[in-house]
UniProtKB/Swiss-Prot annotation:
Protein family according to the UniProt entry: Belongs to the frog skin active peptide (FSAP) family. Brevinin subfamily.
InterPro entries with a match to the protein in the record: Antimicrobial_frog_1 (IPR012520), Frog_antimicrobial_propeptide (IPR004275)
Disulfide bonds: C64-C70
Keyword Disulfide bond listed: yes
Species this protein is from: Amolops mantzorum
Propeptide: 23-44
Recorded GO CC terms: extracellular region
Record protein name field: Brevinin-1MT1
Any Pfam family matching the protein: Antimicrobial_1
A GO biological-process term: killing of cells of another organism
Phylogenetic placement of the source organism: Eukaryota, Metazoa, Chordata, Craniata, Vertebrata
Function in brief: Antimicrobial peptide with activity against a variety of Gram-negative and Gram-positive bacteria and against fungi. Shows strong hemolytic activity against human erythrocytes.
Tissue-by-tissue expression: Expressed by the skin glands.
Keyword Coiled coil appears in the UniProt entry: no
Length: 70
């Protein structure tokens, strides 16, 4: 009976450690995913002003050439 209790206690202890390691890994994966999302937003913030400035410079010239009213 004593060895059975020891074995069960050992299994419980190892299972608890394994479960806590899985939780830590899952938390790290979720944090990684959030970082990717934040990086996408950051790239988007840098990309939109660039496109807007290029359009602001290019569209008047294009309009002038099409209508020939410069």
């Amino acid at each position: 009976m004593f060895t059975l209790k020891k074995s069960l206690l050992l299994l419980f202890f190892l299972g608890t450690i394994n479960l806590s390691l899985c939780e830590q890994e899952r938390d790290a994966d979720e944090e990684e995913r959030r970082d990717d999302d934040e990086m996408d937003v950051e790239v988007e913030k840098r990309f939109l002003p660039l496109v807007a400035s290029l359009a602001a410079n290019f569209l008047p010239k294009l309009f002038c050439k099409i209508t020939k009213k410069c």
